[in-house]
From Swiss-Prot:
Keyword DNA repair attached: no
The protein's name: Oleosin 1
Subcellular locations according to the entry: Lipid droplet; Membrane
Classification lineage: Eukaryota, Viridiplantae, Streptophyta, Embryophyta, Tracheophyta
Organism: Prunus dulcis
Record field: transmembrane: 37-57, 81-101
Residue segments, region Hydrophobic: 29-148
Family: Belongs to the oleosin family.
Amino acid sequence: MADQHFQQPLHFQGSYGQQQPRSYQVAKAATAVTAGGSLLVLSGLVLAGTVIALTIATPLLVIFSPVLVPALITVALITMGFLTSGGFGVAAVTVLSWIYKYVTGKQPPGADQLDQARHKLAGKARDIKDRAEQFGQQHVPSGQQQSS
């Protein structure tokens, strides 16, 4: 029993613990090599097409660049302006909707946090007012009375 040797399985385990036959492994490898080779050839063709397109387009871009560059800059600025305007519009509608819900008492998300912050701020304002009154009363000379 002590000299019993365990052999390593020659086949990989499948996803459910079943051993896959050698032919299945060969088929998987052949499929992977075929797909990888096809993608490699395709990437080479795309690279060659890009180089050819740049070779043809570069003289045209150089000739028309005094017109194209300002036009592209203008189009880009107009597009960014419209997108920014739309974004600010959506933000404004969202904020106005939230304010409407808050004012009508529908408790939108974050309203309780706003109320807590408002109460804390009001409490601190009262504390500062009280301290200012105490400070003012302490530093008034005894001979002078405040006229109210």
